């Protein structure tokens, strides 16, 4: 068809008729788009909502038509005022595209969400929480997201009530700062919040610090020195973003709702939920284990509120009612947790306690004067006052352990099988209730430390709970004795594998007691408590680490027992944390406490840490006297495996005379020194016989002369600890 001809036809309808007349000759059918006349005024384009592909298929169909004439113009003429028959009324109504309902297509989840699943939402979450988790995971890119719902904590955390905490791991320090900055900007822009990012450096501040650090590094390099400052204030590895208080999701106790009308107090109740996002690097998150600490706190709080009996108002207890059965139900020991907030008695109980009888019978000031041993022999003991806090401990320290275990009877509920128990509970019945409770706890602690099979730690924990629920005092001496009982453990070398570590249940009980002592105001950042925990988490025998796969075939080397490498590393991590607590709190140890730590490090084969601790004693100003040096050499003389640190050990011999005051080589020191030299150098006897001229042989001669002088002084009845004064010919 000529393009000029089509160009001359300006009417759209006329042009369509011309095209149809030519196409009909080639047997191609054209279906009309809509009903109506062929007039120019009534012709309109197809609706936009129709599918283009379907219209295209209808317009250009290659199937031949039965009647070519009908296919050319199949639209019948319609007179004015008449409607076509057989068509429904709905087809006449035109629905615009913006009024049609869109079909919701299934959204494809983001690929990052499949790799890093979001934590489940808690009960009654605030509306912002889901979008916040989505933004942190997908847009910011934090990994290993976890969520802790702390809204039920009672008392609430220091960050505020109704708290939800989110934890996330950044890929690096730079990613950490960028993520925190973007999160704060997103919260300000999207939700008009005012977040506070603790630990986040501003962009200009970060540039300034990096520029200063580079300048210091350049100056140090030119001066041929290194930067020794461990913390530059940039790489903290931890940023805490306080989102603030958002709407919805608050937790309210039922009793609070009932008392809301008659609420009397100061301030206003804050409605809403507080959200905090903890962003850390992977190393920092593993180091501080903040998530584990909050999770333990949450578990303790949830277990506390489950069925713990509250103290009831009652008259003061009479002396004869002490041994009656208590009303506290026997529950699982993990549910028997107490805090200061749950043990406050009411007014009647406080009045009864404060005005209770405090008198003591003057004739009952003894704990019995005789004891019957397992062999039937009677031993007379000196009387001791029951009010003395060390009377029981002093009594059982003066007798052998097997006799003490016999005096303690069958167990906790045994009160009359031995003469000691009969007299003990008779005196307890006449004592005030608070003193009687303290004495029973003291007796159980001593029995557990002696590893009596009838006295168990859960029973001791229940007795402590009863003591606390009665609002009795807990002194520091009682707390330390209770802590010793919970941390005491007798290793079982006959089991397979050997049991060398304190069970987790016992450690959990000890931590609960420490937690309660802290709530009562006792100082927990103390050297005594820190050393007890350091020894409590350690192995109770000499060990050496091996791989888990090699453990069944690993023999016992000397006195050292093989243990899994991952277990040994876990113990060392806990010890390292306790050491950092000591350094941060500037806690000073005594010489006896250093000896306990040195023995633990030596038993687990941490020789580098052993010698570092030995040097720290001198830096801390602790006097390394003769007892410490005897302990040092005796420790090495009892075991082997330390031969790679022989130089450090032998260097301690000339160091003794440089101490303040000097430590001279006497007979006792010379004997243990010779044993250590023999272990380190088995050929020392041959060298001495050949009279070789080396420092080791001269040291052997010095020890021999000191031993001979001590023996001669002992034979003459003189002091055997007289120092050995060496001559130049001995060196």
Swiss-Prot record:
Residues 1-52 form a transit peptide. The keyword DNA damage does not apply. Transmembrane segments: none annotated. InterPro entries: Atp25 (IPR040152), NT_sf (IPR043519). Its main location: mitochondrion. One of its GO terms (cellular component) is mitochondrial inner membrane. It is found in: Mitochondrion inner membrane. Disulfide bonds: none annotated. It is a peripheral membrane protein. One of its GO terms (biological process) is mitochondrial gene expression. Keywords: Membrane, Mitochondrion, Mitochondrion inner membrane, Transit peptide. The keyword Transit peptide applies. Residues 356-378 have a biased composition (Polar residues). It comes from the Eukaryota. Probable mitochondrial mRNA stabilization factor. Belongs to the ATP25 family. This is ATPase synthesis protein 25, mitochondrial. It comes from Ajellomyces capsulatus (strain G186AR / H82 / ATCC MYA-2454 / RMSCC 2432).
């Amino acid at each position: 068809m000529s393009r000029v001809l089509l160009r001359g036809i300006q009417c759209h309808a006329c042009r369509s008729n011309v095209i149809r007349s030519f196409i009909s000759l080639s047997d191609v059918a054209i279906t009309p788009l809509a009903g109506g006349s062929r007039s120019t005024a009534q012709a309109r384009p197809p609706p936009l909502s129709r599918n283009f592909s379907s219209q295209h298929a209808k317009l250009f169909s290659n199937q031949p038509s039965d009647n070519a004439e009908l296919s050319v113009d199949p639209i019948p003429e319609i007179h004015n005022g008449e409607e076509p028959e057989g068509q429904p009324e709905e087809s006449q109504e035109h629905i615009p595209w913006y009024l049609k309902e869109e079909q919701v297509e299934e959204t494809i989840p983001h690929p990052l969400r499949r790799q890093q699943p979001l934590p489940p939402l808690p009960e009654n979450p605030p509306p912002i929480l889901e979008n916040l988790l989505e933004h942190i995971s997908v847009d910011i890119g934090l990994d290993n997201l976890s969520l802790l719902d702390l809204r039920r904590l009672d008392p609430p955390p220091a960050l505020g009530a109704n708290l939800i905490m989110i934890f996330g791991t950044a890929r690096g320090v730079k990613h950490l700062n960028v993520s925190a900055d973007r999160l704060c900007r997103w919260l300000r822009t999207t939700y008009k919040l005012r977040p506070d990012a603790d630990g986040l450096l501003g962009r200009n501040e970060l540039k300034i610090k990096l520029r200063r650090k580079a300048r210091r590094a350049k100056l140090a390099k030119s001066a041929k020195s290194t930067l020794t400052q461990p913390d530059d204030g940039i790489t903290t590895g931890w940023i805490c973003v306080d989102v603030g208080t958002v709407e919805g999701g608050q937790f309210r106790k039922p009793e609070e709702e009932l008392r809301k009308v008659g609420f009397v107090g100061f301030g206003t109740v804050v409605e809403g939920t507080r959200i905090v996002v903890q962003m850390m690097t992977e190393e920092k998150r593993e180091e501080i284990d903040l998530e584990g600490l909050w999770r333990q706190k949450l578990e303790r709080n949830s277990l506390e509120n489950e069925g713990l009996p509250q103290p009831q108002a009652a008259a003061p207890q009479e002396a004869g009612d002490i041994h009656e059965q208590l009303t506290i139900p026997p529950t699982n020991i993990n549910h028997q947790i107490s805090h200061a907030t749950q043990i406050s008695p009411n007014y009647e109980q406080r009045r009864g306690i404060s005005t209770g009888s405090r008198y003591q019978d003057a004739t009952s000031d003894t704990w019995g004067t005789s004891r019957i041993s397992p062999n039937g022999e009677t031993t007379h003991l000196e009387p001791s006052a029951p009010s003395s806090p060390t009377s029981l401990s002093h009594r059982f320290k003066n007798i052998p352990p097997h006799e003490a275990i016999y005096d303690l009877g069958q167990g906790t509920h045994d009160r009359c099988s031995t003469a000691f128990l009969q007299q003990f509970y008779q005196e307890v019945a006449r004592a005030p209730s608070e003193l009687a409770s303290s004495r029973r706890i003291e007796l159980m602690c001593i029995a557990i430390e002696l590893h009596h099979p009838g006295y168990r730690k859960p029973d001791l924990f229940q007795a402590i709970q009863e003591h606390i629920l009665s609002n009795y005092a807990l002194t520091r001496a009682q707390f330390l004795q209770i802590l010793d009982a919970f941390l005491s453990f007798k290793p079982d070398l006959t089991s397979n594998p050997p049991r060398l570590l304190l069970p987790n249940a016992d450690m959990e009980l000890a931590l609960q007691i420490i937690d309660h002592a802290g709530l009562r105001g006792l100082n927990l950042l103390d050297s005594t408590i820190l050393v007890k925990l350091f020894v409590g988490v350690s192995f109770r025998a000499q060990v050496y680490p091996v791989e888990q796969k090699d453990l069944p075939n690993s023999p016992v080397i000397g006195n050292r027992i093989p243990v899994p490498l991952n277990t040994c590393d876990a113990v060392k991590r806990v010890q390292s944390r306790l050491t950092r607590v000591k350094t941060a709190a500037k806690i000073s140890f005594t010489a006896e406490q250093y000896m306990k730590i040195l023995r633990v490090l030596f038993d687990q084969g941490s020789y580098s840490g052993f010698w570092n601790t030995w040097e720290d004693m001198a830096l801390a100003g602790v006097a390394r006297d003769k007892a410490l040096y005897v302990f040092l050499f005796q420790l090495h003389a009892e075991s082997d495996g330390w031969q790679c640190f022989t130089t450090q050990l032998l260097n301690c011999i000339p160091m003794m005379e440089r101490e303040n005051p000097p430590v001279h080589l006497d007979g006792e020191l010379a004997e243990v020194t010779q044993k250590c030299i023999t272990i380190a150098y088995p050929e020392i006897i041959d060298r001495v016989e050949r009279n070789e001229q080396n420092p080791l042989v001269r040291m052997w001669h010095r020890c021999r002369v000191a031993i001979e002088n001590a023996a001669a002084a002992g034979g003459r009845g003189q002091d055997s600890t007289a120092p050995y004064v060496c001559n130049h010919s001995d060196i």
